[in-house]
């Protein structure tokens, strides 16, 4: 595995009081890292020679400063997944949306405040498939310490980052996917905290292990950092109580299996009251595609070992659900409810913008430079708009701030247009500050040969209320199913294959905010759109860009 941390975070306390806000400072050097995985030697790109990358811990109200140094050969940006970036949208890290990428040998300092959020988020590269190896946890502690948790204080907190591994350079994987027109090849393994475990053909593969004490309560901070797959996760002989999702508290939900889509996080309490021994934790793919397509069928494993138990003791393996178990997945996703805090204003009841956004995959003619393409290439769209990243030397946010014409159009449709095929466009939906937006997200079968699948839809810049979700087609009568009392609060929703989800949010954050599928195979195909949120009254204004903001190079 990669070496231990190169740098320890420097915490500069601004006030002498223990509970005062602080500046938490890190330096992330992104560069090549030699690693042996699955019996193969590879060079991958990581932050600070670590896989996963460094865990960031802050307290609510702190300011986070990350000096990003790009020693890789690839332009890149870093995204702080789920952080509101209230009036700090220049730091969101969405490539060509809120910033131009940091060029090789370049650097940029991300600086933003984290207020009004607690729980488990994460950070990752937002440039090509580089996020397969450039990612880490971002943990936000309550301002008043563990007593601020709305559940009993855990004895131990354990980050569990689930990922994917390729035996090839991931940039080559992505490029080949473009040349064939069919997207990237499936991964060679799944990982838990960067390690595949022992359930593969490579004898002696690295496996994550955590030691626990009997009779305690652990808080597992579970993150799906995988690039293209939803996952089932279990620990043999143990059950969970889910207490948060996407850094928003939930009412306690008891389960023996976690279902988690790319981009999502789940906080789950686990009591260590099983017979002392060794127990496998395991994860494998949840795949709900309606057309059979190959997927990674490996199982990632780790070990929960009770203190005092010898390392050679046999370990029990959990029974994971079948890969296509939509019943178990639906039960998990649809059973979670939100736990409102006193400061939560509740679900806004007046809606200014009602939208229906369909999305899916379609077929397009091969482009001239897709030299390995045969017959057709994949394309993706939202409301028949296949999103195109701007090719001018400016990000969308800079174009908004400086009034640069011709970079984007403000004509993203509120409803699916009556057309076949798709149009390629950099189209945004413009809303006023504090407008309330409701979006029906509908998984659509654009092509009879491609079918449908689950799509994790992630919204930058906001949390949203998840009012309802279901299978089949949404119709207005389903509004009676809306949960307006205690809905989940999310930043990423797993929209079922051929199904729907309804989200609602208040646009109280000026800027350009990306909404896209968090399956990285689909993002470059165009499964994305942008919300343009106008300035409000002072101080709710988009500030000027940082002086060292990266410049675009076309």
UniProtKB/Swiss-Prot annotation:
Its cofactor is Cu cation. Cu cation 4 binds at residues 455, 517, 522. Cu cation 1 binds at residues 79, 458. Cu cation 2 binds at residues 81, 124, 518. The keyword Repeat applies. Residues 29-145, 156-309, 411-537 form the Plastocyanin-like domain. One of its GO terms (molecular function) is copper ion binding. It catalyses: 4 hydroquinone + O2 = 4 benzosemiquinone + 2 H2O. It holds the Pfam family Cu-oxidase_3. Keywords: Apoplast, Copper, Glycoprotein, Lignin degradation, Metal-binding, Oxidoreductase, Repeat, Secreted, Signal. Binds 4 Cu cations per monomer. GO terms for biological process: lignin catabolic process. One of its GO terms (cellular component) is apoplast. Lignin degradation and detoxification of lignin-derived products. This is Laccase-8. The gene is LAC8.
